[in-house]
Amino acid sequence: KEVDPTRPYTSSSPLFGWGREKSYTEGDSHYWGTWWGLADIEAVQNRTGRFVSEYGMQAMPNYSTTKKITLEEDRHLYSDVLKAHQKAGNGFLKLNSYLHRYFKDTTNVKTWSVKDYTYLTQCLQHYSFKNIIGVHRSKEPYNMGTLLWQLNDCWPVASWSITDYYNRQPKAAWYA
């Protein structure tokens, strides 16, 4: 309206920001209560907007990618190399919290192999997307759209993407 008052325009993406009640009834919604807010995956049942245009769950890159970007001595959780490829604030702690709630006791997570950790985080990401997308679909016609974050990465990293940076086998979440 500031540039061209003759054209209709609606500010959006998102109109109200995640976590604000109006974001569930007007415009599109970014729901990050799962992941950034550490809410249970099932919380989305009561947090579905009219069009949910951003939400996600992290996972490690495919193990073959981890092997390509690390030396053998760096293939342990919390190595400097793996930490450099995890850019989300407290990313590993968030993943561990969800793994503990949904899959396995993480008390001894430091003793797990990176291969096992990768597998479990990808199972978690698949479980998250499958359930969240299922809830969104069940809310039709109230909810008429869902866009997950994100499709791909710009470098090999632990992230929200559902495809592998090197275009290998997609992560498990691809099939959700």
Which stretches of residues belong to each language-model region?
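Aromatic-lined carbohydrate-recognition surfaces of secreted/lumenal glycan-active proteins
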Residues: 2-20, 141-153
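A general marker of short, structured functional hotspots
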Residues: 5, 27-28
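Substrate-binding clefts and catalytic carboxylate motifs of secreted carbohydrate-active enzymes
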Residues: 23, 30-176
